[in-house]
């Protein structure tokens, strides 16, 4: 995937945030990320607008709930009777913020079997960013109990490679990723309504949500979009397939790489390349749910491609460490500093 011409630890743009967390971002590494996007420039990009965000909480936050598309629910994986379900998101808007706003896509965890867009920690992130000028969406997606539509190749892979006890969770990876991309496409489709600059979209998650954020930052445009036809799943027509699902930065909290491993197993091709979105990796070294080795594997992939990353191991910390600090910075402060630096946003006092 490709991102605008931002430098990995670029020494440009406003530094007020980095002054507070300079030690936190000292581990950032990488090379310049090439420009380009198969979807072409957005209207805001064509106008040359760079988003202006605020140093402190400034804007009142208005929240609302929207349906971003539909998906099929099956009575059995790979078949059975079907019924459409609405896919929902909560939208957070900064009242009075200037147009050309950046956006943050927030994705909940829960092992692909539970969790909700209304999780308190996620709402905290949404309100923190929105009060400073971002438009945020916190999304729901199909889970194991929904048994979303699967491509035939995924069904065969699961039968051949995954133990029966794990097949339900592994199967849920596909519709969850498809839904996450649909939510980003909804943002693009509604960019004018919410005054967005879609050249500045970030994806952030926790646990399973970070699996999906990494998918958004690394996979190719056709992945989790073209494997299923509209004749197999008529609800695809509701998911803005004419829009891109590109994100420019990823914030990973204790996520993993299983989607990418399955894609590579299916076609023999790694999705990591020098156009991937820069990533901030936060992961507890004592995580017993998603092993710390997943963070190390993600870092190794970014080292190999030369794309910018920051690596923040939480020593002795387990899974879901939302209250952790790094160099005295909260996870919200850590994330916003990384986004501002990577995207070279303009910061207003």
Outline where the language-model segments fall.
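C-terminal catalytic histidine-bearing segment of alpha/beta-hydrolase fold enzymes
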Residues: 296-299, 303-349
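Short beta-strand/loop motif that positions the catalytic acidic residue
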Residues: 281-283, 287
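Short amphipathic alpha-helix adjacent to the substrate-entry channel of hydrolases
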Residues: 118-138
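Primarily recognizes the serine-hydrolase "nucleophile elbow" in alpha/beta-hydrolase
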Residues: 178, 182-266
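Short beta-strand element of the alpha/beta-hydrolase
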Residues: 100-110
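N-terminal cap/lid segment of alpha/beta-hydrolase-fold proteins
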Residues: 47-98
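Ser/Thr-rich, Pro/Gly/Ala-heavy low-complexity intrinsically disordered linkers and tails
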Residues: 25-47
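Alpha/beta-hydrolase active-site loop
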Residues: 154-192
């Amino acid at each position: 995937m490709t991102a605008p011409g931002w430098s990995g630890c670029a020494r440009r743009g406003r530094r007020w945030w980095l002054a507070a967390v300079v030690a936190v971002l000292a581990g950032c590494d990488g090379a310049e990320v090439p420009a380009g996007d198969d979807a072409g420039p957005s209207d805001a990009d064509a106008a040359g607008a760079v988003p202006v965000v605020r140093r402190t909480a400034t804007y009142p936050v208005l929240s609302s709930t929207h349906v971003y598309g539909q998906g099929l629910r099956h009575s059995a994986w790979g078949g059975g009777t079907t019924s459409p379900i609405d896919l929902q998101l909560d939208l957070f808007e900064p009242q009075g913020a200037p147009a050309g706003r950046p956006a943050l896509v927030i994705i909940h965890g829960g092992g692909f079997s539970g969790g909700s867009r209304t999780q308190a920690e996620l709402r905290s992130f949404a309100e923190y960013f929105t009060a400073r000028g971002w438009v945020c969406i916190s999304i729901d997606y199909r889970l194991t109990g929904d048994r979303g539509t699967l491509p035939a190749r995924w069904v065969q892979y699961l039968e051949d490679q995954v133990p029966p006890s794990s097949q339900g969770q592994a199967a849920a990876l596909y519709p969850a990723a498809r839904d996450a991309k649909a939510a980003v496409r909804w943002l693009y489709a509604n960019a004018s309504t919410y005054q967005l600059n879609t050249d500045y979209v970030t994806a952030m998650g926790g646990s399973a949500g970070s699996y999906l954020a990494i998918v958004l930052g690394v996979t190719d445009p056709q992945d989790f979009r073209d494997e299923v036809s509209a004749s197999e799943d008529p609800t695809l027509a509701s998911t803005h397939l004419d829009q891109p699902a590109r994100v420019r930065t990823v914030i990973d909290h204790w996520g993993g790489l299983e989607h990418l491993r399955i894609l590579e197993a299916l076609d023999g091709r790694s999705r990591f390349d020098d156009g991937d979105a820069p990533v901030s990796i936060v992961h507890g070294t004592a995580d017993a749910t998603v092993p710390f080795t997943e963070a190390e594997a993600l870092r190794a992939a970014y080292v190999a491609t030369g794309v910018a990353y920051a690596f923040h191991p939480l020593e002795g910390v387990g899974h879901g460490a939302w209250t952790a600090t790094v160099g005295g910075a909260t996870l919200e402060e850590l994330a916003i500093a990384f986004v501002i630096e990577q995207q070279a946003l303009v910061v207003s006092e």
